[in-house]
């Protein structure tokens, strides 16, 4: 390897691949170091306290051939935590189904009725299944925005397997309410419940330094952070006005 007689094509390819991966790893290390420096030099900002905001917030759970028991279980846990806080009636939960299997859809409906019976007084829970799942998840959310979005100030878009604490949901609501220029606030998802060895390794690394990496990425982005597709609170009106994109042909 790498003999004095010259560098072969294979050796050139190895050097190129190592160089590319080194750049990627170095970028991640620099990003984490930036977050550490900020942590050490800037005082931690306390969570906002006081009277809660009056915004109406919709929790949206798009589902497509998911386990109804798991979805309703996570939804129930979030609703129960929200019910223990103030102004819980400002929140409503929507299960937005694109499921095609009639038997699975029937199971979803049964799980929904059970969920609605257990939710706290004043909290609305809805289930909607589209007959035609045009444009997949994007179309699912678009359908909700066009049909129900005008009744809510913000939407918290979740994945089918998302589980957020009531405190996290309320803090996202507080932060969005306090910053009138913010259109979207992205949370930092944390992996839980991994079963495989690789999944456990990812979960461990996510717990150890994932939050630092996320803070570093936020430093690069400043006020123009990206949307990861779930676990973020979004102001509905600006989203309706500016975020509809033409189909890519």
Language-model regions: role of each:
Residues 30, 34-249:
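Internal catalytic domains of large membrane-associated glycosyltransferases
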Residues 1-51:
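N-terminal membrane-anchoring/stem segments of glycan-assembly enzymes
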